[in-house]
Amino acid sequence: MKILSIVLIALIICSISICTEAFGLIDVKCSASRECWVACKKVTGSGQGKCQNNQCRCY
């Protein structure tokens, strides 16, 4: 039981790490969300993104 809980915690930590690296701010300046769609498509493979503080954030 103790080993199972340790493995579960390790799995959760690894999952969080992978998710935070995959999505986030990219080095593209913007003034509107539509400017981020093509850049996010190139970086993450998904066109989902928005302009936040004059920088693109991809999802």
From Swiss-Prot:
Disulfide-bonded cysteines: C30-C51, C36-C56, C40-C58
Signal peptide start-end: 1-22
Reported tissue expression: Expressed by the venom gland.
Site (Basic residue of the functional dyad): K50
A GO MF label: toxin activity
GO annotation, cellular component aspect: extracellular region
Protein name as annotated: Potassium channel toxin alpha-KTx 16.4
Species name: Mesobuthus eupeus
